[in-house]
Amino acid sequence: HNYDTMSFTHQGATWIGDGFANKDHFDDEIRNAIKEHMDYCKAYEERTGRKVWISEWGVYQGIADKEDISAYVDYFSNVCKELEIAYCYWEFCSGYGIYDLTAGTFKDFVINYFH
């Protein structure tokens, strides 16, 4: 799993409490955290010969701006692609989802930014 930084990826999540209730924006601090952790994963792969798979990542869509979510998805998936680290976005049609079950459509602001 990777949810760097949780103050951004979990903002507005009802199960966390008030700690992440403030609106946060995707910025260089978050970019740097993602890059640092993915570089660490790549170094681990190279050192051990074991592949890393980020089995869960995403942004809770409670109060985050769609533009910030798009930028996060774009950046995170691009870093993974550049470093050849496999990933799986969390999840299909709930709080982090790529699909709007009520509308019966994919969320362009998420799905269009995968690399």
Predicted regions and their residues:
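Extracellular glycoside hydrolase catalytic/binding regions
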Residues: H1-L83
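Aromatic-rich peripheral "rim/lid" segments of glycoside hydrolase catalytic domains that contact
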Residues: I63-H115
